[in-house]
Amino acid sequence: MAVPKRKTSPSRRGMRRSADALKAPTYVEDKNSGELRRPHHIDLKSGMYRGRQVLEPKE
């Protein structure tokens, strides 16, 4: 079984845990419809992605 050779300092432990925090997802305003959507995702209401029609729009 692996055992640590040295004690982990509180500073190093905190730096390791700093990446574990959850953050709220980011949203951008769609240029055409003004709706909020995730960046690099399809706008589900219009079906547009990067200026192209990808899906049929929801009614």
From Swiss-Prot:
GO BP, sorted A to Z: translation
Going by the entry's taxonomy, the superkingdom of the source organism is recorded as: Bacteria
Q: Where is the composition biased (Basic and acidic residues)?
A: 28-44
**Residue ranges under compositional bias (Basic residues)?**
1-16
Q: Its GO CC terms?
A: large ribosomal subunit
Q: Which residue ranges are recorded for the region named Disordered?
A: 1-59
Q: Which InterPro entries match?
A: Ribosomal_bL32 (IPR002677), Ribosomal_bL32_bact (IPR044957), Ribosomal_zn-bd (IPR011332)
A Pfam family recorded for this sequence: Ribosomal_L32p
Q: Which GO terms describe its molecular function?
A: structural constituent of ribosome
Q: Which UniProt keywords apply?
A: Ribonucleoprotein, Ribosomal protein
Quote the NCBIfam families the UniProt record gives: rpmF_bact
Q: Which family would the database say this protein is a member of?
A: Belongs to the bacterial ribosomal protein bL32 family.
What is the name attached to this protein's record? Answer: Large ribosomal subunit protein bL32
Q: What gene name does this entry carry?
A: rpmF
